[in-house]
Swiss-Prot record:
Keywords recorded for this protein, A-Z: Nitrogen fixation
Protein's name according to its UniProt entry: Nitrogenase-stabilizing/protective protein NifW
Family: Belongs to the NifW family.
One annotated GO biological process: nitrogen fixation
Superkingdom as given in the UniProt entry: Bacteria
Keyword Oxidoreductase in record: no
Xref: InterPro entries: NifW (IPR004893)
Function noted in UniProt: May protect the nitrogenase Fe-Mo protein from oxidative damage.
Lineage: Bacteria, Bacillati, Cyanobacteriota, Cyanophyceae, Oscillatoriophycideae
Quaternary structure, from the entry: Homotrimer; associates with NifD.
Length: 107
């Protein structure tokens, strides 16, 4: 049975984490996706920016292959790291205001 090649136009229509996982043929755990979907998508966004910067002359097929690898990497990252550890979102990067940390008192 022959499958049709994925296109960049199809890729651009994807919206949900599950859509990307199915598009790239990545097996996934729905419970895991439910908990980590925003973090997976945010990490994937960062990774495709890196792919685009590192490989500007890739063909559509090659780019989609790299994007698939990037999505799988983003998905796998949160199996071993927590969102707090990865600090993808601004809320995790900012220091709380009006808070003094104990380590700051010992300086």
């Amino acid at each position: 049975m022959m499958t049709t090649a994925k296109t960049f136009a199809e890729f651009k229509t994807l919206t949900d984490t599950e859509d990307y996982l199915q598009f790239f043929g990545i097996a996934y755990d729905q419970g895991f996706v439910n908990v980590n979907r925003l973090h997976i998508l945010k990490q994937f966004s960062k990774l495709i920016e890196e792919v685009d910067a590192a490989f500007p002359t890739l063909s559509e097929t090659e780019k989609l292959e790299k994007y698939g690898q990037a999505f799988e990497e983003a998905y796998e990252l949160f199996k071993t790291s927590s969102p707090l550890e990865t600090k993808l979102f601004k809320v995790f990067q900012e220091k709380p205001k009006d808070v003094v940390f104990l380590k700051d008192l010992t300086k």
